[in-house]
């Protein structure tokens, strides 16, 4: 009985190793810009302030579980503060979790289509510090649920290193602090693929 158990466990371990070998993991870092409706074009339901402008560093990763399908996530934030109404400093942060479809386009390229949900966290900075039970901060946050869709093109100039031009469209719920309820992010990321 012990011999049979050992053989079954060894077989499962070997099969698991083969399945793990077929998986792919990508990590990337990039820079992008965010664009949305300008403050001058804000409708009556939205505050006349643009969420875009400035440079947005981005960190992202994905894990392809089955052939070209997987999951991923990313976070982007404005590198410097912007001013709301010319006097109140703020910084938007976008984060999302996505379903990913990444079919290869030959040996040196892959398409990346994604869609999912996440959030927009807007930090409004103050000139004073507010303390709670465990920590202190100099900002208050306004958080909003968002849905996103995106596309990217991974180009592999060297083995597993890729350059990815990318676009994301965010549909932000109750984004009343800004001039519209959607924003577009355009950027370029450099990354590495494990398991390609």
Model-predicted regions and their roles:
Residues 24, 31-33, 55-134, 144-147, ...:
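Gram-negative (and chloroplast) outer-membrane scaffold detector with strong preference
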Residues 6, 177-188:
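Short glycine/proline-enriched turn or capping motifs at secondary-structure junctions
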Residues 43-47, 82-88, 133-139, 173-178:
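Extracellular loop and loop/strand-boundary signature of outer-membrane beta-barrel proteins
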């Amino acid at each position: 009985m012990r011999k049979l158990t050992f053989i079954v466990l060894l077989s499962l371990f070997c099969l698991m190793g083969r399945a793990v070998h077929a998986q792919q993991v990508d990590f990337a870092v990039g820079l992008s810009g965010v664009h949305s409706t300008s403050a001058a074009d804000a409708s009556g339901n939205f505050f006349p302030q643009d969420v875009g402008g400035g440079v947005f560093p981005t960190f992202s990763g994905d894990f392809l579980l089955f052939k070209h399908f997987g999951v991923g996530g990313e976070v982007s934030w404005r590198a410097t503060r912007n001013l709301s109404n010319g006097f109140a400093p703020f910084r938007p942060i976008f984060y999302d979790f996505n379903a990913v479809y990444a079919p290869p386009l030959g040996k040196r390229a892959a398409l990346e289509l994604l869609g999912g949900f996440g959030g927009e966290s807007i930090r409004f900075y103050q000139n004073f510090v507010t303390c709670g039970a465990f920590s202190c901060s100099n900002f208050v946050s306004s958080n909003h649920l968002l849905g996103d869709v995106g596309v990217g093109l991974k180009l592999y100039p060297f083995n597993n290193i890729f350059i990815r031009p990318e676009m994301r469209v965010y549909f932000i719920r109750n984004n009343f602090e800004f001039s519209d309820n959607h924003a577009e992010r355009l950027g370029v990321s450099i990354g590495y693929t494990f398991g390609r």
